[in-house]
Each structure stands twice: as structure tokens, then as C-alpha cells.
Amino acid sequence: MNIQPNTFFLKAMLTLLNIKGNNMCWAHKKNMFERFTEKAVKVIMLAQEEARRLGHNFVGTEQILLGILGEGTGLAAKALKSMGITLKDARIEVEKIIGRGSGFVAIEIPFTPRAKKILELAIEESRILTHNYVGTEHLLLGLIKEGEGVAARVLENLGVDLPKLRSNIIRMIGETSEVSVGATSGRSKVPTLEEFGTNLTQMAVEGKLDPVVGRAKEIERVVQILGRRTKNNPVLIGEPGVGKTAIAEGLAQRIINNEVPDTLEDKKVITLDVSLLVAGTKYRGEFEERLKKIMDEIRMADNVILVIDEVHTLIGAGAAEGAIDAANILKPALARGELQCIGATTLEEYRKHIEKDAALERRFQPVMVEEPTVEETIEILRGLRDRYEAHHRLKISDSAIVAAAKLSDQYIADRFLPDKAIDLVDEASSRVRLMNYKLPPSAEYLDEELRHIQKIKNELIRSGDFEEASQFREREIEVKVQMAALMKAKKEAIEEELALNPPIVNEDDIANIVSSWTGIPVSKLTKSESEKLLHMEETLHSRIVGQNEAVIAVSKAIRRARVGLKNPNRPIASFIFSGPTGVGKTELTKAMASYFFGSEEAMVRLDMSEYMERHTVSKLIGSPPGYVGYNEGGQLTEAVRKRPYTVVLFDEIEKAHPDVFNLLLQILEDGRLTDSKGRTIDFKNTLLIMTSNIGSKVIEKKGGGLGFELEENIEELQYSRMRNLVNEELKQYFRPEFLNRVDEIIVFRQLTKDEVRDIAHIMLREIFERVKQQGISLQVTERFKNLLIEEGYNPSYGARPLRRALVRLLEDSLAEEVLSGKIKEGDNAMIDVDENKQVKILLGNSNNQHAFLA
């Protein structure tokens, strides 16, 4: 494509080249430089930057060479790189030959006569090759042809054979001309479009596209719409990751395989990059000119199907103040059938942008692309397996493919098949490959030495000691050669090993990636984890005293979920913990979060006393549009979306507004909830626990009844009666449809004196740990413990009075002693009680022979 530089650049260029004269001369020279491509212009700009960097007040052939290497993407740069020339090496060589300048550089840096000659020779080379543009390749050909400047010396010093380089460039120019299918005189019929797009048909011919499995129905519909006389523009609408772009690739593959009707034979499918089309349009009218040029080329070629991914970006693209956007420019051509265009966008973007513009909407024919099923995803993964095996150089087992489809469907709720399953296979393959590849120790040593040499060399260059720097450069080359030989040998050994015994991606590798993405343990149970799950009750009882019914129910639910036997469409379990205050309802939930979900912070705790008012209910799922906090998300939905494997605690559930219970119905039944932004949040891997104090009065009375009962059964009979009475009270407070969805209602027992004694042990142990961190060793006597239990036991209030007694009897006394300086770091203290039940603190070894609680 011929990129025309703006007039300002041309005038600046001619000034720098010291070209002066009458208007005729200006017009002639202007025409000469108008043929420079954007990349060639960039080379000239970079050459001036290189001159400034070196402190030179001229632009010579060497700066043009550095500009070619700095541009990096043109044919000339590719030709130099293929011969092992890098910008870094060239800069060092240039500095060795001409050194650095004084540092004073004029604003306008003139070109040397030899540099001017190179530009003229570049234009001459372009004319000889019958090209109507001057690119970076012509600049390099001119530089080689001139052959006597500093640039030529630099190339020769770096070991380049100039005639061989010239023949390489000519060959590369010939190859790029041949790539354009159906072109006349070696040029494409749609040069502008190919500059701003990607030819999918050509990529299909070269085998660069992934195979498209399934989607026959959608491709057939697209072909039907493309065959229409007018408004022949399908738009593929579907969720992100369902395979919309793959349908366009599938069409390109069908065209090259002659599996399309005669109306689509010999068509070229080209994707347009809208962002690239807009990029660089600094002046008004440039964008419109590019787009009109593309439309004219498509109209003239008459064999192009344009694909615009993210088609909603057309709306507003290029629309500066008072200008027309891309969508409005394309509308007439889309309606008349002059332009066959396949668009692709998501449901949300289609609704937000295209449906608003009725005139644009009627020009596109919607084709809905649904998410494939798990079975279809497995087939898609099998079709792609060869590509991923070749890329990662390993084998992907059938079990890994099935696991990727099933586990991604079950555990990754916020993305869509097949994209999430493909990503799982890709990342698992990458992980297996990395685990099987390690650098040899000798290579690591050489790499460290190379970095050290390069650091010293760069310091010497900065200080101007080029002679010594050249010695280090020679050493650098030696180390690089050694490393290359070592790496080559290692690579060959690895390739040989991989060819004989390629690593295999299996089900466990996929499960590990799912776990790392979501935090949900889905890998196979290890022996230690199985033991941990089997003895779960014992683990919980180390922190929770009594309450066997609750501990057993929770443990069973966790075991079911971890083994994979739970219902995949419901939460792990849902419980109502009812009972008197202070008996361990919330503590059990904390213990479970700590031991089996990673930490206490893994628990999502919602104090329902904060949701007593009707207007606070929306805080759970997020504020509606137009209200404060709309963009912040819901306190419940956002917490579960970020951590899908967790315990959700609704503390003091009876204090919530009744609307909260309506919100919980679909969570309890289907394990899902839609937030204020329309996103579906997955609760299928959460454990839901609701605590309640309903029935506290009944529990306080212990459900006592009339009649005679055996002494050994009295406690169980009282508990049974109490549980029935609590259930009756719950039925009076909660609606039947809410209670019916809860898995189990667990009534906590009142704490006995022995259980309070055990809780005292746990609380004292925690205090000992806190004091130990300050360097103080603490012990208590049996007398003190008896006093603590006597003052802290209250059946109606559970363990909380014990905590208050502990603060009053132990912590307050101890704090006073520490502040007064009587107890210092390194001391041993013992807490005892005298005859008047007054707490006393003894230091050091005591003669009292009381038993200590450790």
C-alpha cells in the first residue's frame, strides 16, 4: 500500500536534505517523497533520533542503517535479522567507528551527501523493480548499492556479505509479491484491506487455522444469508467464548475445500481490524478516506467477504467532532448488497449498541450462537488435540479431555464452553511441559557469567573505553557460542526424550488447574486428606465442645461434597443451627472454615441484624441501577463470586427482614442467584449455615413434661421434646417453602458443667499462647480453675459468662502486674486463689503442691 506522508513531513524532509529551488523543483521532489511508505518514513525519523542519541549534528548512512534496524518490522529489518544482525551490535560497531559527538545537536539535523545519495538510490531501486512505492527494503538496497559509507563498513565488520544480503532482499520481495492471491503485476487487488486486515482464506491454505468441529447449522445459516441479493450480512451473536470467530474461520476452510455453493466459490474471507484502521489517523478525513478506499477495493474485487469481530466497535469509530462514524459510512453499502460482511458480537453489546440503531440493525441478519453441550465440547477438544499436542510436544489423554469439559462446566460458572475447557487443556499442557523441562546447571552458570560480562562491557562503552569493551565483547561472543552449543545439545536430548517418551496430560493435571483457578479441591483424594476427612469430627471437637449432632451433620456434608457424591445442582448442604446463646453455633462455623476451607477468612459472614429494614435487602445482591453503590456489587454475590468454595454464615437469621428469606429460596434449591447486574452467581460449592436463637425460651425450660421417666433416659427425652418444640416455633416464624428447602435443622444442647470445664481448658490455652509471645510463662492451679467455672457457669447463657469471668479474674489481674513491673519478660507466673476467693499471682517456683493446668 502507498502511504502518503503529510505535507509538513515532506517540507521538513526537503529542508533537511538542503533541497531548494523553484516551485517546479518542489513539486518534483514532493512527488518523489510521496512514494515513501509509513515504515520508510519511520526509518528516516529513527535515523535522526539515532544521530541525537550519539550527539552527532548530521544524519549519515550509519544512522539510516540503525533506523532500519530500529523500525524492526519491515522487509529490510527482517533480512538483516535473518543474517544475525541486531540493533545492539550495530550500535556498538557504529560507536567504535565514528565515536560519540560533542553533544550539541541542532533542532534540524541535515543529511550528509552520502545519505542523500542513498535516498536517491532507493527511489532508483524502486523504479527498477517496477514498484510504485519506496519501502525499507529499497532503502537497504540503496545502502548496499552505494557500498562505500560507514553503514557498509559496519555490515562488513559484522560479517555480512553485501551481495548475498542484496539477493536475500530481492528474494524476500518476490515472496511477498507471490503471497497476494489473484494479483496483477505481483500486487494485490485489495492492498488497503490487506494492510488493515487478515486474510483468513490464505491462513486456511497455509494450515494456520485451528480445525472447526461442529457448528454446521450456524455455518449453513451464514452461507444462506451471504447468498441473499441485498442485506446479505449475517451477525453472529453469542456469549463470550462460545466460538463466534471460529464460525468465520470454518467458512474460510469450507471455501478452500470447495464445500460451499457456487455463489461463494473463490471468495476471500478477510477480517478487518477496526482499531488498526483508526490508529494513526491524525488529520480529519484520513479515517474516512481509508474506509472508502477499502469499500472501493471490495466493490472492485467482487470476491471479498469482510469479517468484523466485535462489530459494535463500528459505532462511533473514527467519529471526531462533526465527522461521520464507520457504521454510517458502511450503511448504504450494507443495505444494497455491495458489501458482504460477517459481524460478531456478544448479546450484551448487540443490545447496548446495535439494537439502539434501528437502521443498522435491519442491515444485519442475526445468527444466534449457543453454548455447546459438554458432549459437543468433548468433540471440539478432540478435534483440537493434535494442535495442542504439537505446540506443547506432549500427549493429551482422553480422560484429560473429558475432565476438562466436565470440570469446567461444573466448577467455572462465569465463563462459557468451549473456551474455558480449551483454556484448561492449554494451561494444563503448559504446566506439564514446564515440569518436564529444566536448564542444566552448567547453562545456568554460563548465563550468570554472560550477564556479568554484558554489565561490565556496557559500563566501558558508557565511559568511552572501546578498546577494552571490544575484548569483553569477544568474551561475550565466546560465552554465547558455548551457551548455544550447550542449549542445542540439551534441546536435542530433550527432543529425543520427548519423541520416545512424551509426557502425558491426564485427569489430575486438569483437576489441579481447576483448583488453582477456583480454589475448589477437585483433584483425587490423597491418603492424608482421606484420613483427615474420616476423622473430621475429632478435629472439630478439638475446638468445639459437645454438640455431637451438629458436628456429625456438618462432617457428613463435607465428606459427601469432597468425594463427589453431592447433588451437583445444589449447595453442599444447608443447615439451620438453633439453640441458646453462647453454645457454639457461630464457633462451629468458624472452626469448619478454618480447618477445611483454608482459613477463618474463607467464611462469608453476614450479620442479619444489618438487614432488618426492607431497603437494606438489596445490599445482598447489589443496588439497582440509579442508586448509590450500583457498581460495587452485592455483599453476598460478590463475596461468593470471588471465592466460590466457601462457608456462608447467615448469623441471627430471624433478625433479617422477611424479604431476605424470599431471596434465599433459589440459593437453597438451585444453588444460584442473579445479582443486580444480571450475572448468575454459582452457590453450588458453598456450605450454607443459618444460626438462630428462636426457641431459646423452650430450651431454657428444657422441654420438661409430666410423668415418670428413667434417670438414664431423662436427658435424651428432654432433648427430643425440646427439639420438637423448637421446630414448632421455627414453623411459626418461617414460611414452609423456606424450611422445606433447608437440609437439616440442628438444635444445639445447653452446655453442662463438664463441657464448660473443657471450654475453660481451651480458653486458658489461648491465653497461655498470647502471654508466651511476650516471654512470660503462665500456669494456673486447680483451685483457680474451680473458681473460674463456678463464676462462669450459667446454663442459660452458654460459654460467654465464662469468657467474662476469665477477663475479670485472670486478664485484669495479670495486666496490672505487668504494668506495675512485678512480672517481666522471662518470668514464670502461677495464678492461684486464697481462702477468701481472691486471685493471687505467684512468681517463680512455688511451694504449693497444687496441680497445674498446662
Swiss-Prot record:
Outline the segment boundaries, as ranges, of region: Repeat 2.
111-175
Where in or outside the cell?
A: Plastid, Chloroplast
Q: Name one GO cellular component term.
A: chloroplast
The record, for InterPro entries, names: AAA+_ATPase, ATPase_AAA_core, Clp_ATPase_C, Clp_N_dom_sf, Clp_R_dom, ClpA/B, ClpA/B_CS1, ClpA/B_CS2
Residue ranges annotated for the UVR domain, each copy included: 447-482
What are the binding positions for ATP in this chain?
238-245, 579-586
Q: Which residues form the Clp R domain?
A: 33-175
Q: Which GO terms describe its molecular function?
A: ATP binding; ATP hydrolysis activity
Stretch list, region Repeat 1: 36-101
Domain of life of the organism in this record? Answer: Eukaryota
The record's comment on protein family reads: Belongs to the ClpA/ClpB family.
Protein purpose? May interact with a ClpP-like protease involved in degradation of denatured proteins in the chloroplast.
Name this polypeptide is given: ATP-dependent Clp protease ATP-binding subunit ClpA homolog
- What organism does the UniProt record list as the source? Cyanidium caldarium (Red alga)
Name of the gene this protein is made from: clpC
